[in-house]
From Swiss-Prot:
Active site: H118 (proton donor/acceptor), K143 (schiff-base intermediate with substrate)
Name used for this protein in its record: 3-dehydroquinate dehydratase
Organism the protein comes from: Streptococcus gordonii (strain Challis / ATCC 35105 / BCRC 15272 / CH1 / DL1 / V288)
Keyword Lyase: yes
EC number: 4.2.1.10
HAMAP family referenced in this protein's UniProt entry, alphabetically: AroD (MF_00214)
One of the protein's GO biological processes: amino acid biosynthetic process
Gene, per the UniProt record: aroD
């Protein structure tokens, strides 16, 4: 599994002060641009892409509807993603599929899409249908992050992930059960076929996130011969 760490600057000064060396153990960097005001995103973008030049980077604009910090219309959301993608070519571009479904045709031209779905309340009963619909669009990655309210929620998502990965071996999946009970899903991603696990450096960006240092130790232990 690849370890992903988010950067969440709230203004240009914070972005300029990021010490990229602190992220050396992360395999991917996720820029959560939703911690900024809409007008600041394109002003801060050069600093982020300069700081992490040569690193794999995910551009994410997480809206309030899916647990983020910014509220945008569908048009504003797509326009901002397109601008950043065209100007800076991040390795991955997150798109909240079910929240902005009417705009998906405008995004399919991008070969580096992460089609995502987030639910901070529950693990929906129709998880198989959700995974199936996202998979049918053949994005670069399918990402699903849902709240686990029981151990069974966690086991169900892990089983669904393993099943979909077995049937679609070329498709990248990233599935996470949020919350304390879901932490095992972050550790066992190699077993289920989930490609990434999100870890925290300073503050967690989702419930149940484990620190980068702990995740690195866990990964090293699991990879021992």
């Amino acid at each position: 599994m690849k370890l992903v760490v988010s950067v969440t600057p709230r203004n240009l000064e914070e972005a300029q002060q990021i010490d990229a060396q602190r992220f050396v153990d992360a395999d991917l960097i996720e820029w959560r641009a939703d911690f900024l005001e809409k007008e600041e995103i394109l002003k801060v973008a050069p600093a982020i892409f300069e700081k992490f030049a040569g690193r794999e980077l995910i551009f994410t604009l997480r809206t309030k509807d899916e647990g983020g910090h910014i509220q945008l219309s569908d048009d504003e959301y797509v326009e901002m993603i397109k601008k950043v993608a065209q100007l800076y070519q991040p390795d991955y571009v997150d798109f909240e599929y079910f929240s902005h479904k009417d705009k998906i045709d405008e995004m399919l031209e991008f070969p580096n899409l992460v089609l995502s779905y987030h639910n901070f309340e529950e693990t929906p009963e129709n998880m198989m249908e959700i995974l199936s619909e996202l998979t049918s669009l053949t994005p670069k990655a399918v990402k699903v992050s849902v709240m686990a309210n029981s151990g069974q929620d966690v086991l169900d998502l892990m089983n669904y992930t393993r099943g979909f990965k077995t049937l679609n071996p070329e498709q990248e999946y990233v599935t996470i059960s949020m919350g304390r009970v879901g932490r095992i899903s972050r550790i066992a991603s190699d077993l289920t076929g989930s490609s990434w696990s999100f870890a925290s450096l300073d503050e967690a960006t989702a419930p149940g996130q484990i620190s980068l240092s702990s995740m690195k130790k866990i990964r090293d232990i699991l990879n021992e011969n």
